Amino acid sequence: MSITAERKQALVAEYANKAGDTGSPEVQIAVLSERISNLTNHFKFHKKDNHSRRGLLKMVSQRRRLLDYLKEIDQNRYHTLIKKLGLRR
């Protein structure tokens, strides 16, 4: 359900604005999207896992807030990110 350290480092390297940048909205959104994707696959086999579903909803809300923040501060970065991640909107 969680992502491996190697995958997380790859996401950070791909979406970071500079080396070692783990706090930028782009990186946080990319990591959350990966975790959301993993949990979505988990629910295909474990439909009654409501405890994890609550965590999924929390992650989706957090990603939504980060996307709204990014859109507010820089719309070009926002549009580039959602296109790169393949998110609707």
UniProtKB/Swiss-Prot annotation:
UniProt key word rRNA-binding: yes
Pfam families referenced in this protein's UniProt entry, alphabetically: Ribosomal_S15
UniProtKB keywords: Ribonucleoprotein, Ribosomal protein, RNA-binding, rRNA-binding
Domain of life: Bacteria
Alphabetical list of InterPro entries matching this protein: Ribosomal_uS15, Ribosomal_uS15_bac-type, uS15_NS1_RNA-bd_sf
Quaternary structure (record): Part of the 30S ribosomal subunit. Forms a bridge to the 50S subunit in the 70S ribosome, contacting the 23S rRNA.
Protein name as catalogued: Small ribosomal subunit protein uS15
Lineage, broadest ranks: Bacteria, Pseudomonadati, Pseudomonadota, Alphaproteobacteria, Hyphomicrobiales
